[in-house]
A protein has these predicted regions:
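C-terminal beta-signal and adjacent terminal beta-strands/loops
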Residues: 88-96, 114-162
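Surface-exposed coil/turn segments at beta-strand junctions on protein surfaces, enriched
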Residues: 21-23, 58, 104, 115, ...
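Flexible, surface-exposed loop regions and adjacent strand-edge segments
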Residues: 1-2, 41-53, 99-104, 138-147
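Outer-membrane beta-barrel transmembrane domain signature
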Residues: 90, 102-107
Length: 162
């Protein structure tokens, strides 16, 4: 993708976050971001003006909603079991200055279970559980090129805390 200098742009936004613990083992997290970023003065050529267009690669809205439930057994070899689920969303995004190509809002649903045994944590996880189609990047040159986001995936991780 080619980045060009624009005459003048403006970006304003706000981000809010909330953490709640309605009962001891349950933690809920919510965050929301709003960004309004546009070109105030961008004359590409004598006949083409991008003044007033939205800045490329800047989503208008971002959203994250996560919940985790922690179980701490009183006996046994497991120190902690954490079950978590999260939804991450990205609002409409324009891929270049002309604002002709965009991606609408999408959300990814992820989940994870992790068990901790002393210095070792074993995780089972799933990402993009709804198999949402989305692009992580797009640009147009002599042809259009895009990078698709990852499809639904499952995996496991083994973490050693040394």
């Amino acid at each position: 993708n080619i980045i060009r200098n624009a005459g003048h742009s403006d970006s304003r936004g706000v981000e809010l976050s909330l953490i709640a613990r309605p009962v001891q083992p349950l933690t809920l997290r919510l965050s929301y971001g709003y960004t309004y970023a546009r070109f105030l003065d961008y004359q590409k050529s004598e006949t083409v003006s991008y003044t007033g267009n939205m800045l490329p690669l800047v989503p208008r809205h971002t959203l994250s909603l996560n919940g985790s439930y922690t179980i701490t057994p009183r006996q046994g070899i497991m120190d902690r079991l954490v079950l978590s689920v999260g939804l991450n969303g990205m609002g409409k995004i324009y891929w270049n200055e002309d604002n002709l190509v965009s991606q609408r809002f999408y959300a990814l649903l992820n989940a994870k279970a992790s068990a901790t045994f002393g210095p070792v944590t074993w995780e089972l996880w799933g990402k993009n559980l709804t198999d949402t189609d989305y692009l992580t990047y797009y640009f147009k040159d002599s042809a259009a090129y895009g990078q698709k986001g990852r499809p639904v995936s499952f995996g496991t991780s083994l973490i050693f805390d040394i």
